[in-house]
């Protein structure tokens, strides 16, 4: 007895698109349409293109002391955030019995401490 396996439909190899197929004339025109206005603006307004120059002044410098007093290491905001993390972690652990929620506050506290150090608070 001869057994024949058959597959429904016609099987044809799927052609993969090459990397260079993305560089069509239409895509290049779209890119030019997006880049040319920005280049023209930079040509006519070079001070906007070089806005990160060294001649600028920091307009937010006057608020540094307020931010450090509100969100600094010894501020009450950070203490309340850590307390809220502990309470939410404990409640979530009681509800789900998942240890990840219980240890989550320690991980978030580390992220807050590292973030404060990176920002400079």
Swiss-Prot record:
Pfam families documented for this protein: TraA (PF05513)
Localization per record: Cell inner membrane; Secreted
Keyword Secreted attached: yes
GO annotations of cellular component type: extracellular region; plasma membrane
UniProt xrefs under InterPro entries: TraA
N-acetylalanine found at: 52
Record topology, Cytoplasmic segments: 97-100
Presence of keyword Membrane: yes
Membrane-spanning ranges: 76-96, 101-121
Propeptide: 1-51
Main location: membrane
Record topology, Periplasmic segments: 1-75
Bilayer disposition of the protein: Multi-pass membrane protein
Keywords: Acetylation, Cell inner membrane, Cell membrane, Conjugation, Membrane, Plasmid, Secreted, Transmembrane, Transmembrane helix
Tree of life domain: Bacteria
Family in the record: Belongs to the TraA family.
Quaternary assembly: Monomer. Interacts with itself to form filaments; also interacts with TraQ.
Entry function: Propilin is the precursor of the pilus subunit, pilin, that forms conjugative pili, the filamentous surface appendages required for cell-to-cell contact during the earlier stages of bacterial conjugation, and that retract after contact is established. Mature pilin is assembled with the help of TraQ and TraX.
This protein's name: Pilin
Annotated organism of origin: Escherichia coli
Gene: traA
């Amino acid at each position: 007895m001869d057994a024949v396996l058959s597959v429904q439909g016609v099987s044809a190899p799927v052609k993969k698109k090459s990397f260079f197929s993305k560089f069509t004339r239409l895509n290049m025109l779209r890119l030019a349409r997006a880049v040319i206005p920005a280049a023209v603006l930079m040509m006519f307004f070079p001070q906007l293109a070089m806005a990160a120059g060294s001649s600028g002044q920091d307009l937010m410098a006057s608020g540094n002391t307020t931010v450090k007093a509100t969100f600094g290491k010894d501020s009450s905001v950070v203490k309340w955030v850590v307390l809220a993390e502990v309470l939410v972690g404990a409640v979530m652990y009681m509800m789900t019995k998942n240890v990840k929620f219980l240890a989550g506050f320690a991980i978030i506290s580390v992220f807050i401490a590292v973030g404060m150090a990176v920002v400079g608070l």
